[in-house]
Amino acid sequence: MAKIIAFDEEARRGLEKGLNTLADAVKVTLGPKGRNVVLEKAWGAPTITNDGVTIAREIELEDPYEKIGAELVKEVAKKTDDVAGDGTTTATVLAQALVKEGLRNVAAGSNPMGIKRGIEQAVATVTEKLLESAKEVETEEQIAATAGISAADPAIGAQIAKAMYAVGGGKLNKDSVITVEESNTFGVELEVTEGMRFDKGYISGYFATDMERLEAVLEDPYILLVSGKISNIKDLLPLLEKVMQSGKPLLIIAEDVEGEALSTLVVNKIRGTFKSVAVKAPGFGDRRKAQLQDIAILTGGQVISEEVGLSLETADLPLLGQARKVVVTKDDTTIVDGAGSEEQIEGRVNQIRAEIENSDSDYDREKLNERLAKLAGGVAVLKVGAATEVELKERKHRIEDAVRNAKAAVEEGIVAGGGVALIQAAHVLDNDLDLTGDEATGVRIVRDALTAPLKQIAANAGLEPGVVADKVSRLPEGEGLNAATGEYVDLMAAGINDPVKVTRSALQNAASIAALFLTTEAVVADKPQPAGAAMPGADEMGGMGGF
């Protein structure tokens, strides 16, 4: 395909126009009085949202240079969302402010590389200041306030805080898995699963011990973990006899249990001679192996596998895991209070955390996070209902963002919200970091850009942006504008805070893209096809050429 090329000022202006188009659509959502944006869908009802990254993803521009500019800013929003789960609109507003001032200075003759170095040093200094001023999250109320701001609903914030504590057994658990599901009932309900749950139920309904609830409950059972299939009862018999002598029930988790092995277990269960339940192992392939190993570590057992030189015929009781209780339904299995050592579980948790850090796949990260939570304490489900499908989608999305926001707050702490932390951290740049020339210009660009989020919040609330920014910059640290009421208050005391991870990620990602904009000297894009252009070889009537 033929290409078109733009150079120097033309290239940068094309990129900036695309950035501005996208940023102008996104920034109207910022703050408590921000507006929503309606997104048309090819199928189904339109989506109404105030989430920056969702809006950004939907925007496709026609002009090739503008399209590239918009795509670069989408990357800012997406990266911030990936890292912190929120702050996408703040990142977009910061990127727009940095690029606008930066390009103005480049057009006036400043060296882009000098400005870039100044921006990088200024951002590093401000990030350090933000981390220093962050306060640790210590109470359920603080999490509720943070999540409530993100979800634009204090009641949802309270439910998320409750979920984080419930999954951690009364302690704050940043690794907790909180999933959001659609519900037919109106409102938001919290359902907490104690222990480890995986989505495989009993192989046969005859294993159920409670016929009314159709579930099997095993108290203080042994747990046999097998990486392959079990079909021959002769392989299993020696171990079964030892378990029967102990007087404990048995949970078998294997790739499959079939044939005479399954029928023998069922017959003994029905006769009441031996209580057991057979369950298929969760997952597939390598993921199944990993999850079996997770269960082994959680329960203090070992996976019976030929890969490690273990077989069913020679297996003994010390190789079996144990738990206080196991509940199995037709759809899932829950293991409560596994007997694994805390040290080994912590080691496994750290290993999974490292895998999450090194993974490039969103899907893999999601699955690893689920495994992490199951080992670290349990799973909470927030069930969301609404009057219409459009409202349900919007609400569910807001809650998912708020959950990630709350986790970010626990991880690195919180700072004053409402754009105040950024504008007050800008004071560390007052002496231009003792830099000179174009590098000092870069520092000043960052200092000015740090006022942009607060100005936008004020504008969306119908206030005069310049007046608000000037007043807040003079207030003591942590005090600022509550845009919902128009009053100037101690924001932390009022529960208006942001996770510092969100704030710093927004700034760092915005600065990264701004530096790319400023140092661009040429843009190469695909040449647009004329509207209704015929395919090569097609005749004027639209048929195949030559026929």
Swiss-Prot record:
Record-listed E.C. numbers: 5.6.1.7
A molecular-function term among this protein's GO annotations: ATP-dependent protein folding chaperone
Residue sites binding ATP per the record: T29, L30, G31, P32, D86, G87, T88, T89, T90, G418, N482, A483, A484, D498
Subcellular location as annotated: Cytoplasm
Enzyme class: isomerase
Superkingdom in the source lineage: Bacteria
Isomerase in keyword set: yes
Keyword list, A-Z: ATP-binding, Chaperone, Cytoplasm, Isomerase, Nucleotide-binding
Alphabetized InterPro entries for the sequence: Chaperonin_Cpn60_CS (IPR018370), Cpn60/GroEL (IPR001844), Cpn60/GroEL/TCP-1 (IPR002423), GroEL-like_apical_dom_sf (IPR027409), GROEL-like_equatorial_sf (IPR027413), TCP-1-like_intermed_sf (IPR027410)
GO biological process, one term: protein refolding
Catalytic activity: ATP + H2O + a folded polypeptide = ADP + phosphate + an unfolded polypeptide
GO cellular component: cytoplasm
Family statement drawn from the similarity comment of this UniProt entry: Belongs to the chaperonin (HSP60) family.
Description of how the protein assembles with itself and partners: Forms a cylinder of 14 subunits composed of two heptameric rings stacked back-to-back. Interacts with the co-chaperonin GroES.
Entries under NCBIfam families matching the protein: GroEL, PRK00013.1, PRK12849.1, PRK12850.1, PRK12851.1
Protein role: Together with its co-chaperonin GroES, plays an essential role in assisting protein folding. The GroEL-GroES system forms a nano-cage that allows encapsulation of the non-native substrate proteins and provides a physical environment optimized to promote and accelerate protein folding.
Protein name (record): Chaperonin GroEL 2
Species whose genome carries this gene: Corynebacterium efficiens (strain DSM 44549 / YS-314 / AJ 12310 / JCM 11189 / NBRC 100395)
Gene label: groEL2
